[in-house]
């Protein structure tokens, strides 16, 4: 969990896409993130990015590692709302959000990762999709429509305006989908492509290309139990 390589790439980047989990960069590494945020540049957070970092160390006085998800993406780690590794997630468009350019060409998304609990979004956040808990990890499994956990469904994708450590405003997009196996779904890939285009000021096409660049054979998410890994 200690250290994070390659953060110097943020110095010239237009967009940060983050999917880390409970990392603890050293002070030199963290400064690249702080400088990026202070420039007001956009951020895309995938699934575990709500708890991307851990510890009381700080990016700045107003932003500790533990606070990154809540302050920059709008949410922190809360819970597994669905049964982990048993129930999946199916996207449902939030009423009033269908006109968002980020949803252009995005059909129903199925994510084998379970629905996360999301409880800290505010009226200033824009929910685009909610996640319905499904009976199993099979893409054809039924939505548990009568399950109280789907009343209401938890947010699955949203837009957030963050305040950087130096007070500058920036924009972020977050989805609690995004485990490796989730990206088998073309519509999830298109959602992320659309968000990247939108947040960097581009015009989102009616149906962005979201094909794999190289063959993609994801392994199911789990911890690696090998000693010393």
Task: Locate the predicted segments by residue.
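Stable alpha-helical elements in mature extracytoplasmic
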Residues: 9, 29-33, 98-102, 188-192
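Extracellular ligand-binding/catalytic regions of CAZymes and related secreted enzymes
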Residues: 135-229
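Short, solvent-exposed loop/turn segments at secondary-structure boundaries
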Residues: 22, 57, 184-187
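Extracellular/periplasmic catalytic domains that process cell-envelope and extracellular macromolecules
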Residues: 8-12, 37-39, 120-122, 149-152, ...
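Short, flexible, glycine/charge-rich loop motifs used to bind or transfer phosphoryl groups or to couple energy/partner
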Residues: 5-8, 99, 116-118, 163
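Structural recognition of the beta-strand scaffold that forms the well-ordered cores
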Residues: 14-19, 37, 42-47, 93-94, ...
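Helical hinge/lid and interdomain linker segments adjacent to catalytic or ligand-binding clefts
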Residues: 1-52
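An acidic, glycine-rich "communication" segment
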Residues: 46-141, 148, 208-229
């Amino acid at each position: 969990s200690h250290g994070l390589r390659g953060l110097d790439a943020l110095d010239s980047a237009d967009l940060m896409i983050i999917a880390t989990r409970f990392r603890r960069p050293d002070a030199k590494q963290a400064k690249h993130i702080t400088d990026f945020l202070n420039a007001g540049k956009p951020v895309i957070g995938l699934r575990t990015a709500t708890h991307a970092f851990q510890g009381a160390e700080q990016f700045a006085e107003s932003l500790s590692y533990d606070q990154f998800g809540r302050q920059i993406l709008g949410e922190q780690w809360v819970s597994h709302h669905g049964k982990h590794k048993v129930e999946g997630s199916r996207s449902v468009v939030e009423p009033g959000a269908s006109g968002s350019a980020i949803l252009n060409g995005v059909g129903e998304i199925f994510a084998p990762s379970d629905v996360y609990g999301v409880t800290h979004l505010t009226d200033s956040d824009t929910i685009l999709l909610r996640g319905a808990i499904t009976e199993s990890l099979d893409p054809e499994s039924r939505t548990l429509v009568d399950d109280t956990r789907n009343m209401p469904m938890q947010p699955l994708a949203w837009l957030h305006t963050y305040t950087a450590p130096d007070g500058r405003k920036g924009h972020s997009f977050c989805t609690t989908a995004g485990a490796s196996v989730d990206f088998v779904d073309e519509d999830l890939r298109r959602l992320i492509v659309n968000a990247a285009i939108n947040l960097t000021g581009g015009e989102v096409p009616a149906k962005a290309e979201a094909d794999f660049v190289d063959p993609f054979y994801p392994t199911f998410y789990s911890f690696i139990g090998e000693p010393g890994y």
